[in-house]
Amino acid sequence: MTRREGLAALLGESAKLAQGPVVGHTSTLRVDQLRAGSQQPRRQFGTEGLTELAASIQSQGILQPLLVRAVGDTYEIVAGERRWRAAQLAGLTEVPVIVKSLTDQEAAVIALIENLQRENLNLIDEVEGKLLLVANALGIASEQARSRLNELLRNPVPEDVETLSAVFLPLGRESWQSFAKNKVRILNYPPPLVEALRQGMALTMATLIARAPENKQADLIAKVQQGAGRKEIVAEVERLCHRPTVRLEKRVAQALGNQKWLDRLDPQDAEAMQHWLSQMPRALQQEIGDN
């Protein structure tokens, strides 16, 4: 079996486990015997959503067991961390679980697919989770995943390309190439913008704000959080990006139109000015020539 075939089989089985319900022997574990999964892509759990889930658990119990794996003398949650957290809010001391023997790679695939299919991840958690999956699939350190994707875009290695295609197949319509080109770069955004994306800001809005001067981005983020629409943000970004250029053009025009200033130039500066004017853009030459 090739690496691609083996990975495809793993992804298919992991997708079944993630989509649930999980089939297997159900047992019960104390909540303090469990710990959050190391392969969990979700960094934040909304307080309001957890409170609602806790209320549901209080009235109906936990309808689907958590999927866990043994790690030393504890159990790591692979799928169901929200249920575990909500169960503690609800005052439960035990939760139903199904224990599976899973590798790090299997656990990462299951955790990511479960989160992508059950409840939308914020964009930063999605990107970081997929990078973790890429690292596991290619057998590299997680911090190398971004640079490796960029390398493969420039110089594709057939086996790695096949592996990545198999990785992204069960995750939706997005290809690994699209992910590498369009989403990975957001991790390089300034920290306030990354945090805004983590809090749920749309990528289209964040991409707009990223075009603005960095010292103005916090104000734009605040405007979006206060309800500003795309049209308003586009106009504000355009104003911030083009205002300095317009001001410079006006100042240049004013200086060139100031005959007294031109007359005060010494011969060396006057010669430099003539040289600079001889290299003016063609559009400006045509405008001057027409007048």
Curated annotation (Swiss-Prot):
GO terms for molecular function: DNA binding. Transmembrane segments: none annotated. It comes from the Bacteria. GO terms for cellular component: chromosome. Disulfide bonds: none annotated. Keywords: Chromosome partition, DNA-binding, Plasmid. It holds the Pfam family ParBc. One of its GO terms (biological process) is chromosome segregation. CDD domains: SPO0J_N. Belongs to the ParB family. NCBIfam families: parB_part. This is Probable plasmid-partitioning protein ParB. It comes from Deinococcus radiodurans (strain ATCC 13939 / DSM 20539 / JCM 16871 / CCUG 27074 / LMG 4051 / NBRC 15346 / NCIMB 9279 / VKM B-1422 / R1).
